[in-house]
From Swiss-Prot:
Chief location of this protein within or outside the cell: nucleus
Motif placement: CysB motif: 1348-1374
Modified positions (N6-acetyllysine) in chain numbering: 224
Encoding gene per record: POLA1
Top-rank taxon, per record: Eukaryota
Functional note: Catalytic subunit of the DNA polymerase alpha complex (also known as the alpha DNA polymerase-primase complex) which plays an essential role in the initiation of DNA synthesis. During the S phase of the cell cycle, the DNA polymerase alpha complex (composed of a catalytic subunit POLA1, a regulatory subunit POLA2 and two primase subunits PRIM1 and PRIM2) is recruited to DNA at the replicative forks via direct interactions with MCM10 and WDHD1. The primase subunit of the polymerase alpha complex initiates DNA synthesis by oligomerising short RNA primers on both leading and lagging strands.
Name of the protein: DNA polymerase alpha catalytic subunit
Length: 1462
């Protein structure tokens, strides 16, 4: 019993703390008296207990004084340094047992962890109730549903913790060693702004006392599923409650039921945000006028504050709580007049290890009384394993593998399974029957049609090995088929739809956080309801801010904002506005404090922000809100890559209870996080679909990167400000800055939601899922392989086929032919870092490179590969192939044998039939779109559906050739591409027979040079070609894809063109189209792209050639000057490159700039880059001598580090120059040397590369023989030898020096005029120097350095890589160009020839044009002695040349294979 003290000091600080302090106080007098009593007791003297006289055990006070005392106790944190998260003092006396308010239970739970079940007198109960019983009490203790209580959530310790922290006042800037946090109550504030009791006006200057405990609630309180502790409560909000709803952060009556606060949160939010426009402007002004970080913020503050919400729906929206009776299911009458459970399923989950044979279906159910949909979970049990045993023809001995000659019957298979298999694997009970099944896949020796033994047994019993074989059966199928797959296939469920559950059962104990739960005891009780539109969903978009802890380098979550739409339609256009309510919560890092009077600023601004004292409180609040809002879809950016993992890790570290509220399934153990596949994170959210707009954007649009800022710019056409991670901590210094941080978080959530709506992600995902028949949450994760897999699974199941087991495709590849090894080794066709193609792909015709200024016609086959599959009936079921041959790789790189086309008389196979269905459905939808006066929503719905059908049909071919696909069939894929090549070549030949020139062709399209400038004639010609080609095929169709006014064709898959677009008035406009050029790739900086675009624009223009060259020259000179003088913005230098794997997985991280920048970004926290992400970096001068690739830095590093500057030479030489040089290659009058000169670069370094590319062609054409000596030896190193007399270095590059009459031998005199010595007197030294130089070059050759021919890479290595392309070893750094010898055999041979050439006096004299010159030189200089000296030096070079085999061809060896054996 807590005594009441009249002393003010006691009431101020709390009676309990004060009395305990006195009790522990010790004094000498007290010790002496105690010792004295002990001595007497030992002596046998009786100890008498002295009863003290207590005066005033109970103090009599009036009601007002008592209220003040209770309030003071509530305000006191009596546990030191607890931050209000562990204990709660509710301020009342222990003898208040007769009080009617349920908050008493919260007090008792806070002290001893037990919740008492009190009868509720004076509470009017609704018809739908759950009786009080002992089971309810235990469930309440476990956080489950409790007995019926009127608005009682006070038992939930977590909610008490959250509210306690929300109202904990920020500590002072210089806190004392031991802090005792105290809460102060604002004048005139309601004790709990979200209280269910009607708010009453309180005179200013007085504290509103709590509502009397003995009065019943003013309104009947129906039941509702509890948000935190599982209590069933329902609150009907009133207008008066909403009026009192402004959030008072320094208030908090913690004994109020938390669930009630949650209920009124949304209506309250609407009122608060409705008043926000004016205060928001003040926030902006404060930020602009501040100093330090504020000035930084001021530079990017928006014109209109985010708090200024212009959506009226947000202010008027009110969340209506739904009454749900957990003791009854919302049943409806079925077709047979029986009571059934109807629900719309959205997501499915199974736990194969802990709950085998059970599938959880999550979705929405209609509640008639509330006229709304609520979440539901249906537990489908007893899904049995289904296995198919293929009998052998003859029994075999498993030990020897030989047949015994005994024929097999189905009874023999049954007996072997019963007596051996079932016993061994402890399968106690099973069902079996013989069935007839078809098979059409890649396992050899499996008949097309056969009788199998079908065995069904409980999934709780062990799974059989996948490679199990027996004496009587050769194969067993279905061993690892999941319960979910079996359920979806057998019940023919294709994506989200309405389902009917017959004989639904109530669950004994809640398994999910859904409002309604049901159970189907067997899968046959679940049936599809067709042609009913989907219900609206609850969509929540969220964004969060993290900050890295400097000590442990962990990301801490400091702010979260979310926008919610409670009725988001999937079959209509996105709602406007896309959200109806919202919330925002902020915490502080452990080493920060909130700005002074932050809560008062929020209150003054009337901005609705929850303030959490700790990260644990913030996470608890977020989980509570997720549970309260109960979203079906959570939308974010980079959720799977970063945010979800961080969120779950922080929940785990902070030990926030009920982590599983992030999903819908109740679980205690969090899945393992941080795996490469993100499996744990995906499982954590089961029941709530995750829509990551980054993943969706990657599938639907093309951007240079998929960061939120880039998506906002590309899709929403607006700018997003980025707040650097290191600035966040500084923003806690002032309230205005912290408010801006929250505003930025809120706006990110809004951007994310708008991007999702703009891309129509959800309707498109729903349509694709319904077409493919997979699970929508997986569709939203991207990747088409699984969709194709499920589409084919449904088709083959329906046609009584046994389907390939999951992952069985890996075994044959590893067993047969070593295909994986060869692919990894990449012997032949390695391209762009990918594995070698397992079969030949599409045909690419050799381009006729050049610039075309006449109309070019582009013809294209519509959906070539799907059309070929239909045209020739190519299917698993129709094409005959030998499986063993189909899976082997032929030796010596020979092309694999292509299977024969199926017989035209065969029935259409399943694959072409499925594709035809998709094509026909798309045609029907497009016809529907042409109807007049259609509803815009319907038009959008049709458009999304036809887009989904197109995406699915076009990706169907991919599953054949994708080696990790379940339906991988390389022979079929090879046959399809073979026919594609054949058709393209046939089309080319047909066009050429029509006297037209085909200048290029690629896979499914050809370009025809019309040599015409009349557009009408061009279209006539195109239609003529089209009709001739289409006559040959039934389903294949070629069409005019476009007309180019002018075309710059550079090489295969690289061209630029002006596309003609006819207008309604008969004229046309042109649009620039680029294909495969550097300027459309993201790994070039914007400056290089802009320069390239300008050059292309000039080349494609109608100007004269001289004008074009002049304009390009001016622009390049200007760009070179701008780069050097620093007038180009840093953003123009940013290079973007995608990661093909996680940064830490790269073997050579230093040589790859984007990889080590990615590692730096990951080390900083705030975001995590992974495989598939795009990294931005700039190449800087940092004072080191490292290569350019090792001097890459993130743009934010360049801003922060003063010692970094842009490497201008790199950008001019390795970014701008290569781009322009490649574009201008076919243009006369512009070459690499000229471009280098215009850019201010040294032109000599580009000459080597300019001539290197033509060396091979020159050799074939006899080019070097036609060159002059000067041209032939222009790149050779000159012979240098110092004069032994004066030390001057003499350079020799010819036999002669000077010209005309001044011509003389180069060895005649020293280049130093003052030196009288002649080099001819030092021929021994010259010879020695020559030998040393030759040896140096030979050593350089044998060093074997290889260098990448790609100008932007220039990777240098001595290690010969294992991957080769047709032109040589593939560069391991860039994986797109070949490595060439840095010093080739030709270069060495030419250098040796040069040394012979400069000392070959006889040859030089012979080449003189006139006899007069020859005679003069011979008489004056070339005496026999001089000629002999020259000859000695020449012979020195010739000795080495004679050892070189470069210039010799051994004919006998060359033609050895042609010898005829006698």
């Amino acid at each position: 019993m807590a005594p009441v003290h009249g002393d003010d000091s006691l009431s101020d600080s709390g009676s309990f703390v004060s009395s305990r302090a006195r009790r522990e106080k010790k004094s000498k007098k007290g010790r002496q008296e105690a010792l004295e009593r002990l001595k007497k007791a030992k002596a046998g003297e009786k100890y008498k207990y002295e009863v003290e006289d207590f005066t005033g055990v109970y103090e009599e006070v009036d009601e007002e004084q008592y209220s003040k005392l209770v309030q003071a106790r509530q305000d006191d944190d009596w546990i030191v340094d607890d931050d209000g998260i562990g204990y709660v003092e509710d301020g009342r006396e222990i003898f208040d047992d007769d009080l009617e308010d349920d908050a008493l239970d919260a007090d008792e739970k806070g002290k001893d962890g037990k919740a008492r079940n009190k009868d509720k007198r004076n509470v009017k109960k609704l018809a739908v109730t759950k009786p009080n019983n002992i089971k309810s009490m235990f469930i309440a203790c476990a956080g489950k549903k409790t007995a019926d209580k009127a608005v009682d959530l006070s038992k939930d310790g977590l909610l008490g913790d959250i509210l306690q922290d929300l109202n904990t006042e920020t500590p002072q800037i210089t806190p004392p060693p031991v802090m005792i946090l105290k809460k102060k109550r604002s004048i005139g504030a309601s004790p709990n702004p979200f209280s269910v009791h009607t708010a009453t006006a309180v005179p200013s200057g007085k504290i509103a006392s709590p509502v009397s405990r003995k009065e019943p609630p003013l309104t009947p309180v129906p039941l509702k599923r509890a948000e935190f502790a599982g209590d069933d409560v329902q609150v009907e909000s009133t207008e008066e409650e909403q009026e009192s709803g402004a959030m008072e952060f320094e208030d908090g009556d913690f004994d109020e039921p938390m669930e009630v606060e949650e209920v009124d949160l949304e209506p309250m939010a609407a009122k608060a945000w409705d008043k926000e426009s004016e205060p928001a402007e003040e926030v902006k002004q404060e930020a602009d006028s501040g100093k330090g970080t504020v000035s930084y913020l001021g530079s990017f503050l928006p014109d209109v504050s985010c708090w200024d919400i212009d959506q009226e729906g947000d202010s008027s929206f009110s969340v209506q709580e739904v009454q749900v009776d957990s003791s009854h299911l919302p049943l409806v009458k079925g077709a047979d007049e029986e009571q059934v459970f109807h629900f719309y399923w959205l997501d499915a989950y199974e736990d194969q290890y802990n709950q085998p044979g059970v599938v959880f279906l999550f979705g929405k159910v209609w509640i008639e009384s509330a006229e709304t949909h609520v979440s539901c979970c249906v537990m489908v049990k007893n899904i049995e394993r289904t296995l198919y045993f293929l009998p052998r023809e003859m029994k075999i001995d498993l030990n020897t593998g030989k047949e015994t000659g005994t024929p097999i019957s189905m009874k023999d298979v049954y007996e072997e399974f019963d007596e051996k298999i079932a016993t061994k694997y402890k399968i106690m009970k099973f069902k079996s029957k013989p069935v007839e099944k078809n098979y059409a896949f890649e396992i050899p020796d499996v008949p097309e049609k056969s009788e199998y033994l079908e065995v069904k047994y409980s999934a709780e019993m062990p799974q059989l090995p996948q490679d199990l074989k027996g004496e009587t059966f050769s194969h067993v199928f279905g061993t690892n088929t999941s319960s979910l797959e079996l359920f979806l296939m057998n019940r023919k469920i294709k994506g989200p739809c309405w389902l009917e559950v017959k004989s639904p059962q109530l669950l004994n104990q809640p398994v999910s956080w859904c409002k309604v739960e049901a159970m189907a005891l067997k899968p046959d009780l679940v049936n599809v309801i067709k042609d009913v539109s989907p219900p609206p969903l609850v969509v929540m978009a969220f964004s969060m801010k993290t900050m890295q802890n400097a000590k442990n380098h962990q990301n801490e979550i400091i702010a979260m904002a979310a926008l919610v739409h409670h009725s988001f339609a999937l079959d209509k256009a996105a709602p406007k506005p896309p959200f109806q309510s919202h919330f925002c919560v902020v915490s502080k890092p452990k080493d920060c404090i909130f700005p002074y009077a932050f809560k008062e600023v929020i209150e003054k601004k009337n901005v609705k922000v929850e303030v959490a004292a700790t990260e644990r409180t913030l996470l608890g609040f977020f989980l509570a809100k997720v549970h309260k809002i109960d979203p079906d879809i959570i939308v974010g950016h980079n959720i799977y890559g970063f945010e979800l993992e961080v969120l779950l890790q922080r929940i785990n570290v902070c030990k926030a209870p009920h982590w599983s509220k992030i999903g819908r399934l109740k679980r205690s153990n969090m899945p393992k996080l941080g795996g490469r596949s993100g499996f744990g994170e995906r499982n954590a959210t089961c029941g709530r679909m995750i829509c990551d707009v980054e993943i969706s954007a990657k599938e639907l649009i093309r951007c240079k990167s998929y960061h939120l800022s880039e998506l906002v710019q590309q899709i929403l056409k607006t700018e997003r400000v980025v707040i650097p991670m290191e600035n966040i901590q500084n923003m806690y210094s002032e309230s205005s800055q912290l408010l801006y941080l929250l505003e930025h978080t809120w706006k990110d959530a809004k951007f994310i939601l708008q991007i999702m709506c703009e891309l129509n992600v959800l309707p498109l995902a729903l349509q694709i899922t319904n077409i493919a028949g997979n699970i929508m949450s997986r569709t939203l994760m991207g990747g088409r392989s699984e969709r194709n897999e499920f589409l084919l699974l449904h088709a083959f199941y329906e046609n009584n086929y046994i389907v390939p087991d999951k992952q069985i495709f890996r075994k044959p590849q590893q067993k047969l032919g070593d295909e994986d090894e060869e692919i990894d080794g990449d012997t032949n066709k390695y391209k762009k870092g990918r594995k070698k193609a397992a079969y030949a792909g599409g045909l690419v015709l050799d381009p006729k490179v050049g610039f075309y200024d006449k109309f070019i016609l582009l013809l294209d086959f519509n959906s070539l590969y799907p059309s070929i599959i239909q045209e020739f009936n190519i299917c698993f079921t129709t094409v005959q192939r030998v499986a063993s041959e189909a899976q082997k790789v032929t030796e010596d790189g020979e092309q694999e044998q292509i299977p024969e086309l199926p017989d035209p008389s065969l029935e259409m196979g399943i694959l072409p039939r499925e594709i035809r269905k998709l094509v026909e459905r798309r045609k029907q939808v497009k016809q529907l779109m042409k109807q007049q006066d259609l509803n815009p929503d319907l038009i959008l719905q049709y458009d999304i559906r036809q887009k989904a059908l197109k995406l699915t049909a076009n990706s169907m071919y991919g599953c054949l050739g994708f080696s990790y696909s379940r339906f991988y069939a390389k022979p079929l894929a090879a046959l399809v591409t073979y026919k594609g090549r054949e058709i393209l070549m046939h089309t080319k030949e047909m066009v050429q027979k029509m006297n037209l020139e085909v200048i290029y062709g690629d896979t499914d399209s050809i370009m025809i040079n019309t040599n015409s400038t009349n557009l009408e004639e061009v279209f006539k010609l195109g239609n003529k070609v089209k009709s001739e080609v289409n006559k040959l095929y039934k389903l294949l169709e070629i069409d005019i894809d476009g007309v180019f006014k002018s075309l710059l064709l550079l090489k295969k898959k690289k061209y630029a063109a002006l596309v003609v677009e006819p207008t309604s008035d008969g004229n046309y406009v042109t649009k620039q189209e680029l294909k495969g050029l550097d300027i459309v790739r993201r790994d070039w900086c914007d400056l290089a792209k802009d320069t390239g675009n300008f050059v292309i624009g000039q080349i494609l223009s109608d100007q004269s050639r001289d004008t074009i060259v002049e304009n390009i020259q001016k622009r390049l000179i200007e760009i070179g000057e701008n780069v050097l003088n620093g007038s180009v913005p840093v953003s123009q230098f940013e290079i973007n490159k995608a990661l093909t794997k996680d940064p830490q997985d790269y073997p050579d991280k230093k040589s790859l700039p984007h990889v080590h920048v990615a590692l730096w970004i990951n080390s900083q926290g705030g975001r995590k880059v992974k495989a598939g992400d795009t990294v931005s970096y700039v190449i800087c001068q940092d004072g080191s001598n490292l290569t350019a690739s090792q001097r890459a830095y993130a743009p934010e590093q360049l801003q922060k580090q003063d010692n970094l500057t842009i490497d201008t030479q790199y950008y001019l030489a390795q970014q701008i120059h290569p781009v322009v040089a490649r574009i201008c290659e076919p243009i006369d009058g512009i070459d690499a040397v000229l471009i280098a000169t215009w850019l201010g670069l040294d032109p000599t370094q580009f000459r080597v590369h300019h001539y290197h590319k033509d060396e091979e062609n020159d050799a074939l054409l006899g080019g070097p023989a036609q060159l002059t000596d000067e041209e032939k030896y222009r790149d050779c190193e000159r012979f240098k030898c110092p004069c032994p007399t004066c030390g001057t270095e003499n350079i020799y590059d010819n036999v002669f020096d000077g010209s005309g009459t001044d011509m003389e031998p180069s060895l005649y005199r020293c280049s130093n005029i003052d030196c009288k010595a002649s080099p001819l007197t030092f021929t021994v030294q010259l010879s020695n120097k020559l030998i040393m130089d030759i040896r140096r070059f030979i050593k350089k050759y044998y060093d074997g350095w290889l260098i990448c021919e790609e100008p932007t890479c220039r990777n240098r290595t001595r290690h010969l890589p294992l991957q080769f392309s047709r032109t040589g070893p593939l560069c391991p750094a860039c994986m797109k160009a070949t490595l060439q010898p840095e010093y080739s055999d030709k270069s060495l041979y030419t250098q040796l020839c040069f040394y012979r050439y400069i000392f070959d006096a006889e040859c030089a004299l012979e080449k003189l044009t006139t006899d007069h010159e020859k005679d003069k030189l011979k008489k004056q200089f070339f005496t026999p002695k001089v000629l002999q000296d020259y000859r000695k030096l020449k012979n020195t070079a010739e000795q080495f040349l004679s050892r070189s085999g470069y210039s010799e061809v051994n004919l006998s060896k060359l033609f050895a294979g042609c010898a005829v054996k006698s």
